[in-house]
Regions:
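Non-catalytic, polymerase-adjacent accessory regions of viral genome-replication enzymes
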Residues: 1-82
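Duplex nucleic acid-engaging cores and interfaces of nucleic-acid transaction enzymes
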Residues: 2, 117-132, 140-143, 147, ...
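Active-site and adjacent loop segments of nucleotide-processing enzymes
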Residues: 2-20, 24-31, 299, 337-546, ...
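Reverse-transcriptase-like RNA-dependent polymerase core
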Residues: 54-57, 88-112, 122, 126-134, ...
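Short hydrophobic/aromatic beta-strand micro-patches
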Residues: 76, 120, 295-297
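Conserved polymerase palm-domain catalytic core
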Residues: 85, 100, 145-146, 151-154, ...
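Histidine-centered nuclease catalytic patch
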Residues: 179, 559-590, 603-604
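Short cysteine-rich loop/turn motifs with clustered Cys
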Residues: 539-568, 592-594
């Protein structure tokens, strides 16, 4: 029987629903009884999902990038009336017609050609995110456990670690480095819609909405897109994994997940038996989006797999495997290139199976990235004043630390990055000379203190006060970081999966909004209080709940718990901020209604503790600052 669910009224209910979608899909898929889900559109178009989608999008750095209609998240969504925006999104779901996307061309790393990035209109981004929120747990429950690209709590480091781990376990050294020609441009819409249906999306209305998303035209080029999924669309990464899921299943069904009549005590015993008594060709797949590698035991089998996969892609997915770029490599002799790293094995007697892994940053890619950083550093000389210089230095440091974090899993990463240290120092010193730039020991600068305090390397820095300096960090400040294999059970959609994530990262998921969802009765109450001014916009109603989370449901004035939604007021700490800043979570303080009146001098101090009175006076002063 096809499943249907109650529409969530709070973000807590939404998360419970996501868990349920995941668990039902997982259990029924494993037993072969999966029938899919209907009634998904009502969930996607619910007030709760819409608000969660808006919150997710506004947290991304590209939220303010306009689409073809010129509208942005802050001006045209967050600063508008709450009920009007929710109603507008819901109307869009009923008769969905996406606007054409704005195409932007960005350089391909190491190539003269550029790749297209499609930027949807902001309303289309919200619709896409609503769809993604509901579909992701259904798809995640079915995806291949060693697919790592565009998936929550998975990354490139885990994909690389899986390759290293599997090589050491099975002792195979032949690798097929897969290259699918122009994958995102050649996704067949009909095939993709059929795959969504077979993976449980049995709501025809949702399938039609996704089809409309895929066919959205490109401004100034075509009115309807016949092929491909636009790179830059929020839902595109999920759809890409859906499209390649059947390839994952087909390859793993041939070896890794081969069903046998005999039940074995371990997978190792099963594989040994398959070796002895079958003609199957060993294959271990690791995929990161459209980048994939396949590990096998001989050149002959590697070439057979290459040919078979090329045929499968052509016949079943209408895709082309680039035979020239899809390489067959023996990693004992030559490194492979995967996700910006090179990887091979070298002989060492004490290592497992006599070979140790050697991982390095891919030299040409790292060099390009560092050249971009050096260009940014040289542009520091154009800064108008010190404040602008400090802002740019912080951005440059973030880029350098980002590169270090990405390549920290490589052997001897400190030596690889140290090669750029002197050049960064010299270029930065030259660029900052007019701003009083000088060389300062790293442990004496005032930025990135927890990092710089461990080094005495001289950094190019500018003075910002008495004995205080802001410096351009060094790429040499890095250490090797051990990565561990991904536990497939780690997922945001189960209690066990979230516990594993906490154990690995010590990071908890963001708490759900503490709603009282803003129903018509709640909005009526707020209107009765006169909260219809421009500052009481969608952003206010959204962030007041996240402020309550941050304050752990306690009043910032009296310190007592806020247990009744009707008694909760979100106080604007500084009232004279512009509309773009006044409703940020940092400017909202959770209070009881009576405590809020005390802050504004509308209530007598009688009955309040001395501490509460002092807090109220403190916040009253901030109102005028």
């Amino acid at each position: 029987m096809v499943q249907q669910f109650k529409v969530p009224e709070t973000e807590s209910e939404l998360r419970q629903l996501q868990d349920k979608l995941y668990s039902i899909t997982k259990e029924q898929t494993e037993t072969g009884a999966f029938r899919g889900f209907r009634g998904l559109l009502e969930i996607m178009a619910s007030e709760t999902v819409i608000m969660t989608a808006i919150h997710n999008i506004k947290a991304n750095k590209g939220a303010e990038t306009a689409g073809t209609d010129g509208r942005t998240m802050r001006a045209d969504i967050l600063q508008q009336d709450y009920t009007q925006i929710v109603a507008k999104v819901q109307r869009s779901f009923q008769n969905y017609r996406p606007l054409s996307v704005r195409r932007k061309w960005i350089p391909k790393p190491g190539k003269s050609e550029k790749r297209p990035l499609g930027i949807p209109a902001i309303m289309d981004r919200i619709i896409q995110e609503c769809v993604r929120i509901v579909l992701e747990p259904i798809m995640e429950a079915q995806f291949f456990k060693h697919s790592y690209g565009f998936r929550t709590w998975r990354d490139a480091h885990m994909a690389l670690e899986r390759v290293k781990d599997q090589v050491s376990r099975v002792g195979y050294y032949w690798i097929v480095e897969g290259d699918i020609s122009k994958f995102f441009d050649n996704v067949n819409h009909t095939i993709l819609i059929k795959k969504l249906w077979h993976m449980g999306v049995r709501d025809q209305r949702v399938l039609m909405i996704i089809k409309a998303m895929l066919k959205a035209g490109i401004m100034g080029e075509i009115s309807e897109n016949p092929l491909g999924t636009p790179q830059g669309g929020i839902i595109s990464p999920l759809l890409a994994n859906v499209y390649l899921h059947s390839m994952d299943e087909w390859i793993t069904r041939e070896w890794e997940n081969k069903k046998t009549r005999t039940t074995y005590s371990s997978s190792r015993n099963q594989y040994q038996s398959l070796h002895r008594y079958s003609n199957l060709k060993p294959a271990y797949l690791v995929r990161y989006a459209d980048d994939w590698i396949l590990l096998t035991n001989s050149r002959e089998n590697a070439n057979r797999w290459k040919s078979r996969i090329a045929n499968y892609l052509k016949v079943n997915l209408k895709l082309e495997l680039s035979m020239e770029k899809t390489l067959v490599t023996n990693i004992k002799r030559k490194p492979i290139h995967f996700l910006g790293f090179t990887y091979k094995v070298t002989r060492e007697g004490t290592a497992m199976r006599g070979y140790k892994p050697v991982v390095k940053p891919q030299a040409d890619r790292l060099n390009r990235k560092m050249e971009e950083v050096l260009k940014d550093i040289s542009l520091l000389q154009r800064s108008m004043d010190k404040a602008e210089s400090v802002d740019k230095i912080n951005r440059i440091n973030a880029k350098i630390r980002g590169l270090i974090n990405y390549y920290s899993v490589a052997n001897h990463v400190n030596l690889e990055m140290a090669r750029y240290g002197l050049r960064v120092q010299q270029v930065a010193l030259h660029a900052l000379r007019r701003k009083g730039g000088t060389l300062v020991s790293a442990n004496n600068v005032s930025n990135l203190l927890s990092l710089h305090e461990n080094y005495k390397t001289m950094l190019a820095a500018i003075p910002i006060g008495e004995g205080q300096y802001i410096g351009v960090t060094s790429p040499a400040f890095c250490k090797y970081q051990k990565t561990y294999c991904k536990k497939p059970e780690e997922t945001p959609y189960t209690v066990k999966g979230r516990a594993i994530h906490w154990e690995r990262t010590r990071k908890k998921m963001t708490l759900p909004r503490m709603e009282e969802i803003l129903t018509s009765s709640t909005l009526g109450m707020l209107i009765a209080y006169g909260k219809t001014k421009p500052i009481y916009n969608l952003e206010y109603f959204l962030n007041r709940m996240y402020a309550l989370n941050r304050d752990k449901m306690r009043c910032r004035i009296c310190g007592k718990p806020i247990v009744d939604g009707d008694d909760y007021h979100a106080h604007h700490i500084r009232k004279n901020l512009p509309l773009s800043e006044i409703n940020r979570v940092s400017n909202l303080a959770s209070t009881h209604r009576s405590c809020h009146k005390l802050v504004h001098g509308q209530k007598s101090k009688d009955g309040f503790s001395p501490k509460a009175v002092r807090q109220a006076e403190k916040y009253r002063k901030k109102l005028l600052s």
